[in-house]
Amino acid sequence: MDKRKACTRTTVGAACAIFVLTACLCAQEAPAWKPFDFDEASRNIPKPREIWPLVREHTVPLEFEIRSDEIVSSDTDPSKKLRKVTAHFYSQELAGKKWGHPCVIFTPEDNRRNLTPERKGKVVIVGSPGRDYFDVHVDKYGEPIAAKTAYPTMVLSNPGRYPDGSDVERDIGILSTLRKQTGKNYYNMNCQLAVVYIQAMNAFQQFLGLDDLNAVVGGHSKRGRSATVAAAIDPRVGSVIIMGNEGVYATDRIQWHLSFHHAFFQDQVDVPVFYIGATNEDGYKMFNVNIMQERLRRPMTIEMIPNYCHSNFSEIQFMDFMMCVAHVFDGRPLSRISEVGHQRQQGRTIFRARIESEAKIQVAKTWYVYTDDPAWRDLMWYHLLMRKVGDHYEATLSGKIPDAFMVEVGDIAMGFPGYVSSTPQKLTDAPVIERRSRGSLPRLWEPSE
């Protein structure tokens, strides 16, 4: 035998043996890497219903006080008279300070209709920021909803005021301070503002002299996200309306605020949830609303307001809030958008969607956008009218394919107009980064030096 060949075979055989032995030793010494198991890691994270007994300890007596009570002509329908009550109550005490809540309640002048079995206990609660925002919410949400639906409606300041008159919202960082001092993660805006809603239902129930309520509860941003927490805790919440705030939780780690994300505790929320967002939403990644929707077994009804920002003064918000109330309490039908898609054909983009509705469809639009900003901030969305083609609606755009599009439907039923939309659909590989938070200020705004 050739000695060189024998040596080669021996060397290779020895190397293989060493490799196998080394691999076996490594397998014994270091366990195989496993991907992060979010479901397992989050199994014992408490949800709102389990946390409530701890949070409840901070609640205080309502001390509900009526400060004015008058009959007024409705601005929305001057033929109607409304009872307008200005009141105040307390919800909780944190860091030695009570949270107080100015509120305005509207009912029909003659409220006997709301004592009938089919209407008894049905109420609307709108969470509002304080200061100048509050009066706008009274005039644009509270009074029109009460006038047109005839359901008792409360607009309250949430998170409210301290006894010295200063705004809790300007001091909302106290929750982060308390969390760090105590190690208790339930100090969270979505939790403490939910307590406000629960106490508001107690105050409303006391005012109306009822044994139970069925409340549509909602508001903008944290005032909306906290309403889902209230729904998980309190069965009196019959529906939730969220206006803006597209925060999502990570699934590659456990974040301290996980307990208060709707998708995480969705098994505790058995009511319809409406999301009224905006294409220029602040501080979140574009398309986060898609993640929010995909994680829910019971999808939200969505309206993404084109070319609007993180704020709560859009006419569509006023309109859709009332539409949601009419849907939940009186069965006002909603349009449903499905099978949203597109096709490239001879230099054109054809947009399609199936739209089903028992309401009268007044307009169907495709909204599309081109982006030159990875944050997708301050972009202009343009629309195309869609027309019925067979069992779908279609619109065609010639030229370059957009970076994203969505479908929106405007309809009317039972005298209540409204809008719903699909989630935005991404069409290209345009980058997407998290937006730098600027509230409702534009991308090019900078603070003064």
Where do the protein language model's features map onto the residues?
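N-terminal cap/lid segment of alpha/beta-hydrolase-fold proteins
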Residues: 57-117
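Gly/Ser-rich "nucleophile elbow"/oxyanion-hole loop immediately N-terminal to the catalytic nucleophile
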Residues: 118, 179-221, 237
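The feature captures the conserved acid-bearing segment of alpha/beta-hydrolase catalytic domains
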Residues: 249-297
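Surface beta-strand/loop "capping" patches
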Residues: 324-368, 382-391
